[in-house]
């Protein structure tokens, strides 16, 4: 009899714990620390909330937060509806936002930590900087859920202590291959802010088009696709300011000396090499073109373009390219005593002083400059390398003392798996039975498609020493736009890139070191629904059945622990 009572007691306790657990709202990215109390639901009227802050940026962010709460009427799955009869109204409508130092600028490595406390006494956000407080508001926005009684509640009192694991949590977009409208770029910034990503790397131009209007060389935009596909100086400044207001840095990239044709040749055709060659003879994709490293005019133009853009883009970091330099483009200049490596070294010797004249400048380059067949012996150790080749490059570079941003094409190239795009390619006709051609039928050079699970499971600091790990600034997903424009930009990126957001914010392991992909599944599926509620056209990841029936679509009934 006593045993039966004990069994019943423990069963009831287990059921109680299940109910308590099910009622908790999980936000994305998962915070470092969340403590839920076992008390009653807190009823909040978002229309009555007011921010207790003197910071205009935070006041505007608070207005957006309240608007999103009311617009989304968010209720995550599979949380049961709340009976608010036993709930308690919050005692004050003031949201207290305390910032220790509101003067700190948004730059690489800024303190983004925050603490959020919600109970019946009120809502309090405490952060070291304005940028941490923005993250606190984003978390608050996801925690307040809507009920069938048309009320808004937080399931119980909760305390969140949070900070990111990595300084750089990035996304790269490319407006050189296909134009991206201002509105489509702003949408990416919105979703980045919602997922606490902080770095938008903007590959502004490429050999195909130059969409950036410059006062120093106004005729460069003759190589824009049309008059409607141009970014004015005001457009650029608006995007930078819009992003900053949401805690997102905008890092510009002008790819040099490779991938350079459009725009540059409008200034002076002599500063571009191999522009008239057929592309397969001189480039990795059409059209060909690289800057003439031997011409003094080249460096005059580089200086003027770079300085004007540095006045517009306020971030300390500027990406100056240096990828995929093609030896065959310089065939007319090469000799046994003047190799393409010699040309690259000469370019760096002349270009680096130009780049470093800007105060507080931090340069980023693609890893090609040290790891490709055409590479320099060394570059200054204060240059950050973006690793897109083999993942072994991370250890190679960090062991040599370089900071890196990881963008492995095997895990983080979002354009992969979309099939080849070069037209009239007879190889598809000649070898239809060869499923291995160009990584298989479809011809994507970097297939397969990078799913959210592939992204989330990527351990990008594996086999690194602690010293080497300290040189990893973070990770960045990259979407090259050969097959992307504004019509599909958001759906190509989201919600799978939210896996990267969590991976770089709090990681993919729990406090015991166990992989938490099992619990992340429902978190990212809900985050997708949340984005849809806010009006964003993001891709479904699974049939909705899987969202409504958590883990019914898992491969294994009893998932392995690893």
UniProtKB/Swiss-Prot annotation:
Its EC number is 3.2.1.52. GO terms for molecular function: beta-N-acetylglucosaminidase activity. One of its GO terms (cellular component) is membrane. It holds the Pfam family Glyco_hydro_20. Induction: By growth on N-acetylglucosamine. GO terms for biological process: carbohydrate metabolic process; glycosaminoglycan metabolic process. Keywords: Glycoprotein, Glycosidase, Hydrolase, Signal. Glycans are attached at residues 38, 52, 111, 337, 382, 396, 463. It catalyses: Hydrolysis of terminal non-reducing N-acetyl-D-hexosamine residues in N-acetyl-beta-D-hexosaminides. Residues 1-22 form the signal peptide. It comes from the Eukaryota. The keyword Glycoprotein applies. Belongs to the glycosyl hydrolase 20 family. Has a broad substrate specificity. This is Beta-hexosaminidase.
């Amino acid at each position: 009899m006593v045993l039966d009572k004990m069994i019943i007691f423990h069963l009831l306790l287990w059921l109680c714990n299940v109910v308590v657990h099910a009622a908790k709202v999980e936000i994305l990215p998962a915070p470092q620390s969340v403590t839920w109390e076992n008390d009653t639901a807190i009823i909040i009227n978002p229309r009555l909330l007011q921010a207790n802050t003197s910071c205009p940026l935070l006041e505007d962010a608070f207005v957006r937060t309240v608007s999103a709460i009311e617009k989304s009427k968010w209720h995550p799955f599979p949380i049961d509806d709340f009976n608010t009869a036993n709930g308690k109204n919050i005692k004050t409508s003031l949201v207290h936002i305390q910032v220790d130092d509101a003067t700190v600028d948004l730059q690489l490595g800024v303190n983004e930590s925050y603490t959020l406390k919600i109970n019946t006494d009120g809502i309090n956000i405490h952060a070291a900087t304005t940028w941490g407080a923005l993250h606190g508001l984003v978390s608050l926005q996801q925690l307040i859920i809507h009920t069938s009684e048309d009320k808004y509640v937080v399931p119980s009192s909760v305390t969140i202590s949070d900070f990111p694991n990595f300084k750089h949590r990035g996304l790269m977009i490319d407006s050189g291959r296909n134009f991206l409208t201002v509105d489509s770029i702003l949408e990416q910034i919105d979703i980045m802010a919602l997922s606490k990503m902080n770095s938008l790397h903007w590959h502004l131009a490429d050999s195909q088009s130059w969409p950036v209007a410059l006062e120093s060389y106004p005729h460069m935009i003759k190589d824009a696709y049309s008059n409607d596909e141009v970014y004015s100086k005001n457009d650029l400044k608006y995007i930078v300011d819009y992003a900053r207001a949401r805690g997102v840095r905008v890092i510009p990239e002008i790819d040099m000396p490779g991938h350079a044709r459009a725009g540059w040749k409008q200034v002076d055709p002599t500063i571009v090499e191999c522009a008239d060659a057929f592309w397969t003879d001189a480039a990795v994709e059409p059209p060909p073109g690289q800057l003439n490293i031997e011409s003094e005019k080249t460096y005059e133009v580089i200086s003027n373009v770079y300085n004007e853009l540095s006045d517009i883009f306020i971030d300390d970091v500027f990406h100056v390219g240096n990828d995929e330099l093609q030896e065959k483009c310089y065939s007319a200049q090469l000799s046994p005593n003047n190799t393409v490596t010699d040309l690259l070294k000469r370019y760096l010797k002349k270009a680096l002083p130009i780049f470093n004249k800007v105060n507080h400048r931090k340069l980023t380059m693609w890893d090609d400059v040290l790891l490709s067949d055409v590479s320099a012996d060394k570059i200054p150790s204060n240059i950050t390398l973006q690793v897109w080749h083999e993942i072994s490059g991370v250890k190679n570079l960090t062991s040599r003392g370089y900071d890196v941003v990881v963008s492995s094409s095997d895990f983080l190239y979002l354009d992969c798996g979309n099939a080849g795009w070069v037209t009239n390619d007879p190889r598809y006709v000649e070898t239809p039975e060869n499923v291995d051609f160009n990584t298989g039928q479809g011809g994507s050079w970097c297939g397969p498609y990078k799913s959210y699970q592939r992204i989330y499971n990527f351990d990008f600091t594996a086999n690194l020493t602690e010293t080497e790990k300290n040189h990893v600034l973070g990770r960045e997903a990259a979407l090259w736009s050969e097959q992307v424009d504004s019509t599909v930009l958001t759906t190509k990126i989201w919600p799978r890139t939210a896996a990267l957001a969590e991976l770089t914010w709090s990681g993919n392991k729990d406090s015991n070191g166990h992989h938490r992909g099992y619990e992340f599944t429902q978190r990212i599926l809900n985050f997708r629904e949340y984005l849809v509620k806010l009006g964003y056209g993001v891709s479904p990841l699974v049939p909705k059945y899987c969202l409504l029936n958590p883990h019914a679509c898992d491969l294994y009934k009893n998932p392995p622990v690893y």
